[in-house]
Amino acid sequence: YTIVGRNVPGGKPLEGVTLNGAQLQSLQTNVQIPADLGVSGLGVQKMVTSRIARAATTAAGVAVVMNVSDLPSVVESGDNDEASKATKIPVPVNVSGQFYPARDVDWYEFNAPQGAVFWIDLVSHQLGLPTDPSILLHRVVKNDAGEETVTVVASVDDPGDRNGRIGQDYDDSTDDPSYKFTSPAEGTYRIRVLDNFGVNRNDPRMQYELRIRPENPRVRLTAELRQLKTAN
């Protein structure tokens, strides 16, 4: 893993990378991921971040919380800011990437058989970041001459109930988009991901995880540590 921060023991300066005027450092190190998930002892989580599986560990002598997933992992790499340069990925998958530099757009491409069902989650706001991600899903069909016909399958920004829940007593909503995808036909599909707040922001800390996962019903139990207001 690469640890980035200030006063990192054994860290090397990152040329041209600063935060609030301070030089940042990086360190390549091994990090032991605990077998048991959880963040016991590291404080109360925000509602919006409680959806993500986490594990508490240490890196460079500092306690950290890591996001974890049991999906096959891929790290964003290369020039994929155009549909024609989309990064080919397997499914299911967990892609780790960045909304960086400013105006960054990333494209990914995968194949799916007819009738396959996947949930497509773009996770960033749930990582505790001030982002507003969105996804665009295309179906791509090529003729014998290699010419493409592109059809929009879905364009997803905020979840449908987001606006109605902001400011309510129990608000665990998020700006992260999530879409249930049922493949209409065997073939190729492309996903574009971007941050609506990233037009003028040039910050490598704005990370995301693109998760394409099988449908798997589950139960999540949360508790809110404040008194709820009641109607008169």
Where are the predicted features?
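Short, aromatic- and glycine-rich surface loops/edge beta-strands on solvent-exposed regions
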Residues: L42-A59, I191-V193
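Predominantly extracellular/luminal regions of secreted and cell-surface proteins
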Residues: A59-P92, R218
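Glycine-centered structural positions embedded in regular secondary structure
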Residues: G5, R54-A55, A86, P90-F99
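Acidic, Ser/Thr/Pro-rich low-complexity intrinsically disordered segments
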Residues: Y1-G41, G97-N232
